[in-house]
Every structure is written in C-alpha cells, then in structure tokens.
Regions:
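Conserved beta-strand/loop subsegment of P-loop NTPase cores
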Residues: 50-58, 79-91, 107-114
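N-terminal accessory targeting/assembly segments
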Residues: 1-67
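Histidine-anchored nucleotide/phosphate-binding helix
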Residues: 68-78
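A generic structural signal for short, solvent-exposed coil/turn residues
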Residues: 13, 85, 102-105
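Canonical P-loop GTPase G-domain recognition
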Residues: 90-138
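Residue-level signature of catalytic and energy-coupling elements of molecular machines
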Residues: 2, 77, 128
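Short amphipathic alpha-helical segments
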Residues: 67-70, 98-100
Length: 138
C-alpha cells in the first residue's frame, strides 16, 4: 500500500474500462516486517510505502498499555523514516503520567484522547491532516 504509480489507459473509473500501471516511482519511505517463511533472501515484506507518520494508538486501560508494543512500533517507525505519533486512549480510566514520562526523552508528539472530550481529537486531526499515515495499535 502506498506506492506511487503512473497509469495509462482510461482513468475515468467507469465500468468496463481498462487502465494499467506503466511505472512505479521510487519509495521515499518503506515500513517492513520480517518474515521467517518467505522465499525472499531478505525475509522482509513491505507493509506500507511513502507514509509520513506512524500513529501508535494505545489504550491506557482495558487492556493496560503494553510498552513493549510501543517500543517495537517506535523502532519500526524510526527504521522506516516515519515520524511516530503516540495516541493514548481511555485516559479517563487510568493514570498516564508514568507512561508519558517514559517516552518524553524521545520528543514524540503525544495526543491524549478521552471519550467525554471530543475536543481532544482535534490535536490528533491537526497532526495527521494532509499526511499519509500508518496506524498501529490495540
């Protein structure tokens, strides 16, 4: 997902028309995952190309936040050249200070959302506006 391509043919999208890919542009970023059972010698599969940001969505409660998952996502984001954004949900159900303090040294953009505060989503929208995103989380 995310490859930029050049097409030829009928690009109207009407039924019974044909178009084809004639070129695939170079990727500016690539998020990959490793595969142990793939024939490719690199053992990797591209998940998304040309993304700008990775939004790491984490519930603070029900279930509790898993810092290992956050850490793995951060490593993948930095490796792929993506800007990580940490989005914490269910902040009305748990204390978030300890988690925020743990990731403060990374200088991450962090958004805290609450179901009873619709305005808390505005900052997340602002950070993601006009950008190609990859969302990860539980």
């Amino acid at each position: 997902m995310g490859d930029r391509v050049r097409l030829t043919g009928d690009l109207t999208g009407r039924t019974d028309t044909l178009a084809r890919i004639v070129a695939v542009d170079d990727r500016s970023t690539v998020l990959r995952r490793s595969l142990e059972d793939v024939a490719d010698t690199r053992g990797e599969k591209a998940i998304v190309a040309n993304a700008d940001v990775m939004c790491i969505v984490v519930a603070l409660a029900d279930p509790p936040a898993r810092t290992g998952m956050i850490d793995r996502c951060l490593v993948a984001a930095y490796e792929a050249g993506l800007e990580p954004i940490l989005c914490l949900t269910k902040s009305d159900l748990a204390d978030l200070e300890e988690l925020l303090a743990a990731y403060e040294p990374f200088g991450l953009s962090c958004v805290v959302t609450r179901f009873d505060e619709p305005a808390s989503i505005k900052e997340l929208r602002r950070l993601l506006q006009g950008r190609f995103k990859n969302n990860n989380g539980k």
